[in-house]
Amino acid sequence: VPDSQQKKSIVVLVSGNGSNLQAIIDACAQQKLPANVSAVISNKADAYGLQRAKNANIPAVFLDHSTFTSREDYDRQLLAEISTFSPDLIVLAGFMRILSPDFVAHFEGKMLNIHPSLLPKYKGLHTHQRAIDAGDTEHGVSVHFVTAALDDGPVILQSKVPVFAEQDPEELAQRVQVQERQMYPLVIKWFCQGRLLMKNNKAFLDGNELEVQGYAAD
């Protein structure tokens, strides 16, 4: 089988800068991932992630949520756009919309998200400030399968960073993002190699059910 046919197809959804998208594009280009990014789709016209896609000659699709009357209508159109690329995997990389249950169900077990906290702590926004305000000594990032509840799907991998005294959230965010750019391509690689799957709302790697905090490297 030609190499190109063995590669998995990924569609990445972004709303902003797309630094994780860039890490994924680079990993594919360097043959570190047995995959190709088939398209990048954004709900924001000015998302720099769209420019990153164009720079890499990847189809960049802007789908404006403000022109739809309901979340369900938007998600139906989003589903149609994604389906034209026949992806094996959907990757949320800073996609700042809550997805409707029907959309999530359609891609069950084939959609990943990265969230800047040690889930189940700090679902939602402003995670870095919340970790600092709580006096946490460690913070981090989680990659998880997407389920209908926000930031609630089974965790695949977490990475921790220390929280220093007098820490400001921007600096903490930067250190978390360094971890993100290493972790996300790794988890995507596991998926593309057929090593990672979700069943019964649990994540499995190499046939082994993962712990609540995901794969433990230590």
Predicted regions and their residues:
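Short, structured coil segments at secondary-structure junctions
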Residues: A56-N57, F107
